[in-house]
Regions:
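Bacterial N-terminal signal peptides
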Residues: 9-17
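N-terminal pre-domain segments of enzymes
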Residues: 22-102
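Short, acidic/polar N-cap/turn motifs at the starts of alpha helices
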Residues: 60-62, 103-104, 124, 251, ...
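Conserved beta-strand hairpin/beta-sheet module of binuclear metal-dependent hydrolase folds
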Residues: 98-159, 278-280
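Metallo-beta-lactamase
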Residues: 107-108, 157, 192, 197-274
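Active-site metal-binding motif and surrounding structural segment of the metallo-beta-lactamase
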Residues: 131-132, 142-192
Length: 280
């Protein structure tokens, strides 16, 4: 009996991936999408100027690859977004995905603050310290984190990591930590995170792992291929990178708002927002 139940459960998981491909937009969908065009000012291109501002460089490959040669994150897979919005897509989501498609290394504040975007659903932010880099969030996987760190070392400065900040315990903010440590000449840098970080990461990814995975399947459209009738992106970003990932125990835990720490000459003041983005 158990074997039959498992087979049925497996079928319920697999079958949707075979029937997810969509056909042409219905008349209702076309009318709804056309209505959006009248509600928003699509002639305003300021966001595109903002998204491209400070661009330095990106990788010269069609995808971010893992160490064993597998695709971690496709870059050219979203090239269909270069075209005008089709009838099958909500114009606002299409535009947002076009903005999210910008990828590579960007200068935010000259000689002080840089970001790597579009290699994962999460960004990596690099703060220039006295002797190296302080990194805010390290993406979901080692492949994406390595690509980002390599990019700033190549185009700005090849410096060690002096500190890493995990803003909260969702995997896209800490998963690439091993690649950062491996790529840095300094291995014993500080890792700053909210109080209760490890317990929360365990609760969400182990104890609630099955439910979180199910939610992510809907949330990220994991069974849809990128296309005009499939996955257009997640809104927040295009997609999560795939491949090996890890976690590291924080060396400093933030417990109160206003708490200050100085890392390699950079004083940082933290805001503790319990139970907001995640458990901590």
């Amino acid at each position: 009996m158990k074997r039959k139940i498992l087979s049925i459960a497996f079928g319920l998981v697999v079958v949707p991936s075979a029937i997810m491909a969509q056909t042409a937009a219905t008349e209702h969908t076309i009318r709804a999408n056309e209505a959006v065009k009248t509600e928003l000012d699509f002639n305003d291109r300021q966001d595109f100027e903002d998204a491209s501002r400070g661009f330095i460089a990106t990788v010269n490959t069609s995808a971010i690859m893992t160490e064993d040669g597998k695709e971690s994150y496709s870059l050219e897979g979203w090239d269909f977004l270069k075209n005008d919005v089709p009838e099958t897509a909500n114009p606002s989501l299409w535009r947002q995905s076009q903005l999210n498609r910008f990828n590579g290394l960007f200068e935010v504040i000259p000689d002080k603050l840089y970001q790597v975007r579009g290699f994962d659903i999460a960004n990596m932010t690099f703060i220039r310290s006295d002797h190296g880099w302080i990194i805010i969030d390290v993406t979901t996987t080692n492949a994406a984190a390595k690509a980002g760190y390599d990019l700033i070392k190549k185009h700005v400065a090849d410096l060690p990591v002096e500190g890493v900040i995990f803003t909260h315990p969702h995997g896209d903010h800490y998963g690439g930590i091993a690649a950062i440590r491996e790529g840095s000449s300094k291995k014993d840098f500080e890792i700053i995170a909210p109080k209760g970080f490890m317990a929360s990461a365990q609760n969400e990814n182990v104890l609630a792992g099955v439910a979180m995975t199910r939610r992510a399947t809907y949330m990220y459209g994991l069974q849809l291929e990128p296309s005009v009738t499939g996955n257009l992106g997640c809104g927040l970003g295009q997609a999560m990178s795939t491949g090996s990932k890890g976690i590291a125990r924080p060396t400093i835990e933030i417990e109160t708002t206003g708490e200050k720490h100085t890392i390699d000459g950079v004083e940082m003041e933290f805001v503790y927002v319990l139970d907001r983005k995640s458990v901590v």
